[in-house]
């Protein structure tokens, strides 16, 4: 299949076709959407996904069991479409949603309708306590959370950047705090994410740090957490290497970075690390999606993570490996953070531009606050808010 796809391109397009190309190609409609909305994935990732799909949508949507994307799944989508020409979409177990239409607008409106119907149903049915209730009721103030994150982030970054420099991102949103403060944090985190589009960014499971936000002496508790950091990081690396060795096949690519991407800190929030700021932020956003899915799935049924072998076969799929190898080579300062004093002046901004062009993130400092704000806006517009 992979060898044939380049022969189907137009205008000598040398970009490799998506792994999902057959899934779109065999659906017999002019316009096809493939989506991963939290509300629908929450239904797709329950133990009784098929029954819930039928309960919510009746005969409007079809359903297919989990299968890795590819040619065979494309044929199954086509078969279901032809056997049931009245359906307006298909839920893929543990994966996502397909919808379609004869025109782009009708396809778009169909997608919105399906997502809204799932969200409305969940809002009506999910009236229980999320994540087994709260173990801690926001025990730390915003300034205390920031202080803990500020202490942990550079330490973790240094310890996991021995092979490749990494940049961090922190999220303390309400949905994240509800998860990291929950009674069921550790068992749910251990289940891993289900949607493959999530765990390809986040790894299959996060690292939950050993930290008690209700300790009488916060400084002493933070010192204890820091003291045990090496052991926790090494335990995750060992667990990931064991996962690789259990699941690898004869032609599997070599093991990749064994460090966690997502770090959950009780009472504090979520920290993510990746090769650059944008990738770290996106990984964080994807794990927020996973949190939303777990909350809604467990509220109406029981959340089911993807089978470990299936997850490995996606993560180390040769087609995914080929995609990684096609990515642009890192710039010379990727993963570096530069602090520039006098950053609002001509020399400071020129220095910032030079470093940004080489892949660094920059922090600007200047005694002229107004000029510094203007410089930040200018550079953010040219390079993105992620890196300035």
Predicted region positions:
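Canonical Rossmann dinucleotide-binding motif of NAD(H)/NADP(H)-dependent dehydrogenases/reductases
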Residues: 331-363
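Conserved glycine-rich Rossmann-like NAD(P)H-binding loop of the short-chain dehydrogenase/reductase
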Residues: 358-375
């Amino acid at each position: 299949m992979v060898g044939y796809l380049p022969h189907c391109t137009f205008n000598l397009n040398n970009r490799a076709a998506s792994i999902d190309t057959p899934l779109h190609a065999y659906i017999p409609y002019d316009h096809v959407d493939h989506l991963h909305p939290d509300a629908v994935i929450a239904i797709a990732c329950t133990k009784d996904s098929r029954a819930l799909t039928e309960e919510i949508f009746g005969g409007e949507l079809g359903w297919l069991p989990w299968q890795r994307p590819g040619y065979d799944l494309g044929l199954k989508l086509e078969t279901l479409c032809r056997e049931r020409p009245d359906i307006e979409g298909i839920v893929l177990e543990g994966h996502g949603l397909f919808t379609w239409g004869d025109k782009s607008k009708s396809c778009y409106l169909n997608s919105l309708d399906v997502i809204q119907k799932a969200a409305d149903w969940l809002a009506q049915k999910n009236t229980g306590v999320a994540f087994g209730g709260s173990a801690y009721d926001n025990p730390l103030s915003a300034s205390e959370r920031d202080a803990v994150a500020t202490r942990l982030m550079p330490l973790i970054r240094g310890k996991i950047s021995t092979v490749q420099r990494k940049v961090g991102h922190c999220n303390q949103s309400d949905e994240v705090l509800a998860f990291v403060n929950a009674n069921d944090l550790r068992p749910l985190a251990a289940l891993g994410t289900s949607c493959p589009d999530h765990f390809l960014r986040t790894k299959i499971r996060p690292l939950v740090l050993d930290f008690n936000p209700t300790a009488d002496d916060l400084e002493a508790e933070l010192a204890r957490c820091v003291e045990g950091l090496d052991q926790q990081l090494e335990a995750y690396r060992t667990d990931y290497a064991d996962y690789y060795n259990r699941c690898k096949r004869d032609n599997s690519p070599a093991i990749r970075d064994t460090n966690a991407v997502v770090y959950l800190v009780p009472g504090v929030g979520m920290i993510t690390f990746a090769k650059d700021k944008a990738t770290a932020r996106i990984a964080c956003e994807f794990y927020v999606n996973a949190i939303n899915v777990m909350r809604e799935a467990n509220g109406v049924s029981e959340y089911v993570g993807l089978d470990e072998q299936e997850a490995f076969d996606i993560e180390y799929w040769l087609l995914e490996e080929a995609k990684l190898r096609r990515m642009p080579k890192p710039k010379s300062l990727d993963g570096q953070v530069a602090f520039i004093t006098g950053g609002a002046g001509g020399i400071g901004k020129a220095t910032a531009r030079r470093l940004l062009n080489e892949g660094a993130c920059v922090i600007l400092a200047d005694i002229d606050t107004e000029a510094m704000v203007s410089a930040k806006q200018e550079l953010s517009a040219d390079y993105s808010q992620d890196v300035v």
